[in-house]
Amino acid sequence: QTCALPICSTTADFLFESAQISETKCGLQTLPGAYDENGKSEQLKVVLADKEGKTKLELYYDVYEDCDVITRRAVFKNEGEQPVKLRRLMSMQLDLHRADYVLSTFHGAWTREMNRSEAVLETGKYVNESFTGTSSSRANPFIMLGRKETTEDTGECFGINLIYSGSHYEAVEVQAGRTRIVSGIQPKNFCFTVGTGEVFETPEAVLTYAASGY
């Protein structure tokens, strides 16, 4: 997470402040999000604070037990006296303690939207992104990570989807035998000014896991 603070810093030092668990979801104010028709979900809210920059970062994790889904989003709050320019704020980050995965991305065109491409992960970074102002079938904001032996019926698989129709960014990086996944708004040319007392919320990312195939 990167921001330009009034103290001339390009990073923030967010430290844990509080956490809260509730049985109802605090919905997004400006963007669409996931929901359960029966209202069965739990929410974990983690508040991080940067004392120097007088800003806060609220991380929301919503658990949908019936469908094995966790959603993740972030809300940035400016409680200082000067505006803050956000240049990067991802919706989710997930670290896996393995590196032997196969990345699946999806692309296509009208009437043939979901063509699957696969890449066996090695050391380095793999990016699925859009710069066009839309998501569309040309660069779908949904990715999957499975093991090399994963099939339709066996093996583990992670699925990540960003609920956002604008320019998006999904990156998977492998280093030192570990895998890091991030997903969110496209950071290239992104700059959003958050005024005093204002907030900025990211799109919601949907994460799911299966131990029995795709």
Give short role names for the model-derived ranges:
Residues 2-5:
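Short, small-residue-biased leader/transition segments that mark boundaries at the very start
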Residues 9-214:
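Conserved structural scaffold segments of CAZyme catalytic domains across common CAZy folds
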